[in-house]
Amino acid sequence: MVLAAIPSPSRGVVHLGPVPLRAYALMIIIGVFVAVFVTGRRLRARGMDPMVASEVAYWAVPFGIVGARVYHVVSTPAAYFGRDGNVLDVIKIWNGGLGIWGAIAGGAFGAWLATRRYGISLALFGDAAAPGIILAQAIGRWGNWFNQELYGKASTLPWAVRIDEKHQIIPGVSTYQPTFLYECLWNLVVAGILLVVDRRHRLGRGKLFCLYVALYTFGRLWIEMLRIDTANQILGLRVNIWTSIVVCLGALLALAVTRSPVDPNLSREEQEALGIARSRPAARSTVTTAGTADQRAAAPDSAGPDSAALDSVGPDSVDPDLGGPDPADPGSAGSVPAAAVPDASGSTATTATTATTATTATTATTATTATTATTGVPAGSQQSRGLATRLPASGGHTSAVPPEEPQLP
C-alpha cells in the first residue's frame, strides 16, 4: 500500500493556439539559458567577454542535440529498427530519447569548433562552463518526469513517482523510483562542489571540467543501476553503465596526469583570466642615458651648431631598441672622459672629446653628426652597433684632418 507518491503530470504538451509547446523541449530550453547565463557571469569574473558564452552556445547546442539523439538511437536500436519499431520515429525528438553521452560528445565538438573559430582556449572555456552545464542537466531531467519515462524499479517509498497505466513497464504497478529526481539532486550537489572547488583551489587548465565529468559519471553509475527500461547490455550490465565507468576512469586519469597546481603552458593572459596572476600595470618607458648630463655640463657653449642640435634632443627621444651608450666602446658618449689639453698660458682646459661635438671637415662625419641629431642616438652607440663610421682619434682628441688615402701601386 502506497501512502504517498509524487504525482506525474497529466499531460506533457501545452498548446499555445496552433503551436504545441512540449514540456520536454521547454526544460531543455530553460536549461540552455541557465547554462549560458551562468557561464557568461563566470567568464566576466575571469576578465573575458560574457558574450562568448552565447557565441559558443550557437554551435554547441545544435551539435549536442544531434549527438544526444544519435547516441540514443544507436544504444536502443530495437525501438526504431526492430520488428515493432518505426524508422520515422528517429526524427521525433519531441517524444523524448536523448542520450547524455551523445549530448556531451556532440556539444564538446560544437564548442571546439566555436572556440577554434573565435580563438578561445577550449579547456579554459570548459572550466568556466562546467557549473552551468551541470545545472542545465539538472533542469533538463524534469523532462523525463513530464514524459513519464526512464524511471527506476518499483517502489513504495513516500517519494516514489506515480506513473499512469499506459506508461507503466510493470502492469499493475503504479509507483517507481524517481530516477529523474535523484539525478537532478545529484547534479545540484555536483554544481555546488564545482563552485566551491573553483573558488578555494586554483586548478590547472581543463581540470575543473574533468572534475565535473568524473563526479557526474559517478552519480550516473548508481542511478543507471536503478532503471528498468529496455536497454542493450554487455556482460549483464547496461551499456550506459559501462559508458559511465569508462568515462569516469578517463576523467580521473586526466585529473591525475597534471600534478602541478597550475598548468605551465598557461599564457600570461590566461593566468590573469583564471585569477592565478594579477594584471601588470603598464610601465612607463624611461630610457636613461648614462653621462648625458655630465657631457652637457662639460661641453663649451661654442661647440658649434652640431652640438646645439644634439642638446635640443632630450633623453626621451633615444631609441629604446638601441639603448644608451655602450660602456665597452671607447668611442661611446658615456664612456669617453674629458681630456686635459694645455693652453697657451700653461693652464689646463677641459675639452669634451665626444665624437658628436667635434668639428670635422669631411662630409661623412657631418652626415654622421646630422643623423645623430635627428634620431637622438649618441654617435658612440651608433658606432658600436655599426650604424655610424668611427672617427679616428689621436692622443685622445678627435682629429679634424681626414686621414690620407692609401696610394694604389
UniProtKB/Swiss-Prot annotation:
Residues annotated as binding a 1,2-diacyl-sn-glycero-3-phospho-(1'-sn-glycerol) = 141
This protein's UniProt keywords: Cell membrane, Membrane, Transferase, Transmembrane, Transmembrane helix
Entry EC number(s):
2.5.1.145
User: Which Gene Ontology CC terms are recorded?
Assistant: plasma membrane
PROSITE patterns given in the database record: LGT
Q: Which InterPro entries match?
A: Lgt (IPR001640)
Compartments where located: Cell membrane
GO molecular function terms listed in the Swiss-Prot or TrEMBL record = phosphatidylglycerol-prolipoprotein diacylglyceryl transferase activity
One GO BP annotation here? lipoprotein biosynthetic process
- Offer one Pfam family short name for this entry: LGT
Q: Which domain of life is it from?
A: Bacteria
Q: How does it sit in the membrane?
A: Multi-pass membrane protein
Ranges in coiled-coil conformation: none
User: Which residues fall in a compositionally biased region of kind Low complexity?
Assistant: 297-309, 320-335, 348-375
Q: Where is this region: Disordered?
A: 273-409
Membrane-spanning residues: 18-38, 48-68, 93-113, 119-139, 177-197, 234-254
* Pathway(s) where this gene product acts: Protein modification; lipoprotein biosynthesis (diacylglyceryl transfer)
Family from the record: Belongs to the Lgt family.
Q: What is the role of the protein in this entry? A: Catalyzes the transfer of the diacylglyceryl group from phosphatidylglycerol to the sulfhydryl group of the N-terminal cysteine of a prolipoprotein, the first step in the formation of mature lipoproteins.
Task: Please state what the protein is called.
Answer: Phosphatidylglycerol--prolipoprotein diacylglyceryl transferase
Q: Name the source organism.
A: Frankia casuarinae (strain DSM 45818 / CECT 9043 / HFP020203 / CcI3)
